[in-house]
Amino acid sequence: KEAFLIALRSPSLRLLLIIAMCCSFAGYSILGWGPTFYIRVHGMTTMQVGGLMGLAVAGGLFIGNVGAGRIADRVAKGDFAVYMQVAGWGTILAAPFGLLFLLAADPMLSLVGLFFSKLFMTFWMPPTYAVAVGMSPVRNRGMITALLTLSTTVVGIGMGPVFVGVMNDLLEPSFGKEAIRYSLVFVLGGLVACGLLCFVGTKLVRREIAARPVTAQ
């Protein structure tokens, strides 16, 4: 309860929760419907999807997570506002690669787009978790992190794939099997929103630190 109230009272932490929701909305939608996309649109077998898509997603997420943390630490030097900028640029860069993933006619080119979109898509996570921990009281950091993770799970898994399914049903009469392609294009808006909100977060973080200095441990 205490951690929840702290998150509600802090503009920075509230925004971080929204950022997590926007990014996970796009991320889990692609993970959930990506295999269907490759099977319907590119005619892949389930074995091909498991191998090729799995490699692109796993590789992108691994490099993106490690790279985002490394870049944020090196560039920010402890400045939480700069951490937010790293997260913002990463998620915005993910959107054009997401379009390449979805709109490319060649399946291999689509997989390249998927790899880089996943790489940049995950740039939001290490910096924003670092900011959430640093902006929280020491005794509540575990619960604040839990709230952040819960928000990604509830919105990402609970709403993202459902939204794509509804959009697919609406678009299928007009686009047939291509409906899944355009249904997934809509969720890329979550990445753009996430990136823009990260830049808004730089101001909120600086303002909150100036009003209530926090010593990160």
Locate the predicted segments by residue.
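Loop-to-transmembrane helix entry/capping segments in MFS-fold secondary transporters
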Residues: 46-50, 138-148, 177-180
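Helix-to-loop junctions at the C-terminal end of transmembrane segments
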Residues: 64-80, 168-169
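C-terminal transmembrane helical hairpin of 12-TM major facilitator-type secondary transporters
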Residues: 78-128
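Extracytoplasmic gate region of multi-pass secondary transporters
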Residues: 9-68, 120-129, 156-164
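A membrane-interface helix-boundary motif in multi-pass transporters
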Residues: 45, 82-85, 168-191
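Multi-pass alpha-helical transporter architecture, strongest
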Residues: 95-104, 185-217
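Paired intracellular helix-loop junctions of major facilitator superfamily
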Residues: 76-78, 132-141, 172
